[in-house]
Curated annotation (Swiss-Prot):
Protein location: Endoplasmic reticulum membrane; Golgi apparatus membrane
Topology in the lipid bilayer: Multi-pass membrane protein
Official protein name in the record: Protein arv1 homolog
Record keywords: Endoplasmic reticulum, Glycoprotein, Golgi apparatus, Lipid metabolism, Lipid transport, Membrane, Sphingolipid metabolism, Transmembrane, Transmembrane helix, Transport
The keyword Glycosyltransferase is assigned to this record: no
Keyword Glycoprotein: yes
Regions crossing the membrane: 73-93, 124-144, 162-182, 188-208, 216-236
Top-level lineage group: Eukaryota
Organism this protein belongs to: Dictyostelium discoideum (Social amoeba)
Record InterPro entries: Arv1
Main function: Mediator of sterol homeostasis involved in sterol uptake, trafficking and distribution into membranes. Also regulates the sphingolipid metabolism.
Gene Ontology biological process terms in this record: intracellular sterol transport; regulation of plasma membrane sterol distribution; sphingolipid metabolic process; sterol metabolic process
């Protein structure tokens, strides 16, 4: 566990007194900064979520280091489920763009695929698999850049926590559901993309305890890796045109 204010390790974030399970707790103060080690212990999750939305580092420290037991490897199943939902939303929006392009070819599109049939419903699987691959390449590119810069200084980096930080900070993808319910312009997806990337910067900065400049470098490297992957797919099959956006 760590102090969410200064990031220093602490033995615990609260002490329980009275009967076990009574709910009577006293928050621990950090010996380094003399602030409450983790104020979010007593807060509802909606408050934590709002602070995530506001890019507050304390909220990321709480969720990554204090909310769940320490893991040497692997990531919790909850993160996997959330990631599947993210990819489903993103794939559906891409599919809608492809469908919109078929109806209005003169307008901008996310996907234009030169399939002979006019019904794109049975092609959703292709977009879904591509979205999975894009996210995987994005994460792997960030991991490679982190290894390149930090491996000599920190030979042991918990990359499972780095992946969790990226998934957690990609919560903005969940707002894509608004485009599924209401008729938002597709530019809304591009705004969400920028928001997600900025959230990734904050989460990586918190986990690695690094500078904002380095965190931006890691995210940009991941973004370029994703762009390169899309370019390779386009070169492999020239009948497919991809634009980097939601």
């Amino acid at each position: 566990m760590i102090c969410i204010e200064c990031g220093r390790p602490v033995n615990d974030v609260y002490k329980e007194f009275g009967k076990a399970g009574s709910g009577n707790i006293r928050l621990t103060r950090c010996a380094s900064c003399n602030q409450t080690a983790d104020k979010y212990v007593e807060y509802d999750f909606i408050i934590v979520f709002l602070d995530l939305f506001l890019h507050k580092a304390q909220a990321y420290r709480h969720l990554l280091f204090n909310r769940q037991p320490y893991r040497d490897f692997g990531i919790p199943i909850q993160y996997i489920k959330v990631l599947v939902v993210y990819i489903f939303f993103e794939s559906y929006i891409k599919w809608l763009r492809f469908k919109e392009y078929e109806q209005h070819p003169s307008g901008p599109a996310f996907y234009y695929i030169d399939w002979q049939d006019d019904v794109p419903y049975d092609r959703y699987w292709f977009i879904f698999v591509t979205a999975i691959a894009e996210f995987a390449v994005y994460i792997l590119s960030i991991i490679l850049s982190v290894r390149f810069i930090y491996e000599s200084r920190y030979p042991i980096i918990k990359y499972n926590y780095l992946i969790m930080a990226i998934i957690l900070s990609s919560f903005g993808k969940g707002f894509l559901v608004l485009m599924m319910i209401w008729d938002y312009p597709f530019s809304f997806g591009s705004i969400l993309n920028i928001f997600v990337l900025s959230s990734n910067v904050v989460a990586i900065k918190v986990f690695l305890d690094t500078t904002t400049f380095k965190a931006i470098f890691f995210v940009v490297f991941g973004f370029l890796g994703k762009l390169l992957f899309q370019s390779i797919i386009y070169l492999f099959d020239a009948s497919m045109l991809l634009h980097l956006s939601f």
